[in-house]
Amino acid sequence: MAEKENTKRNRREEILQALAQMLESSDGSQRITTAKLAANVGVSEAALYRHFPSKTRMFDSLIEFIEDTLTSRINLILQDEKDTFHRLRLILLLILGFAERNPGLTRIMTGHALMFEQDRLQGRINQLFERIEAQLRQVLKERRLREGSGFDHDETLLASQLLAFCEGMLSRFVRSEFRYRPTQEFETRWPLLACQLQ
């Protein structure tokens, strides 16, 4: 029984990895059909539906992976780091680095892969970025408590500026067919971003 469950889980993971790889390839700029995905995995469409009730559920699983990975690592940063600027830098670097290591998933994060899918999938991505923006805002607000001084500008504006930088770098990565890495020149860009926060 346990062996059958492992085989099923492995097949699910294989399907999700194939979908992510297709999103990374030139197929990712077009609608990915279950027929194409089944051919890529080497199974029938019926076999896909034994593991996932719909293609939407496959995208849900990939979005869940993105959410879990980013949220858990942001929480670790907040737990381990106390300096505001260091926290912000690490959170941005986390988002950019995750995207760089997972180009196919970046198409989901930017919404490109979701254009032909159900609207609620884009809603989930929107909520993820809203939660990240809220965490950035909280880090900025906590500076006054932690370090005794706040910022000259509204924390909401600053948080949205930081997130807009990340989203812009992810869009550039997708638009360039993954040539321009999101972390490229980050160490040069970060001081410019940090200056805007002063």
Swiss-Prot record:
Positions the record marks as coiled coil are 117-144
| Residue span(s) of domain HTH tetR-type | 9-70
Pfam families on file? SlmA-like_C, TetR_N
User: Which GO terms of the molecular function aspect are on file?
Assistant: DNA-binding transcription factor activity; transcription cis-regulatory region binding
Compartments where located = Cytoplasm, Nucleoid
Query: Can you supply one Gene Ontology CC term for this chain's record?
Result: cytoplasm
- UniProt keyword list: Cell cycle, Cell division, Coiled coil, Cytoplasm, DNA-binding
DNA-binding region residue numbers: 33-52
- Biological process GO terms, please? cell division; negative regulation of division septum assembly
Protein purpose: Required for nucleoid occlusion (NO) phenomenon, which prevents Z-ring formation and cell division over the nucleoid. Acts as a DNA-associated cell division inhibitor that binds simultaneously chromosomal DNA and FtsZ, and disrupts the assembly of FtsZ polymers. SlmA-DNA-binding sequences (SBS) are dispersed on non-Ter regions of the chromosome, preventing FtsZ polymerization at these regions.
Query: What family does this chain come from, according to its entry?
Result: Belongs to the nucleoid occlusion factor SlmA family.
Its subunit composition reads: Homodimer. Interacts with FtsZ.
* The name this protein goes by in its record: Nucleoid occlusion factor SlmA
Species annotation: Edwardsiella ictaluri (strain 93-146)
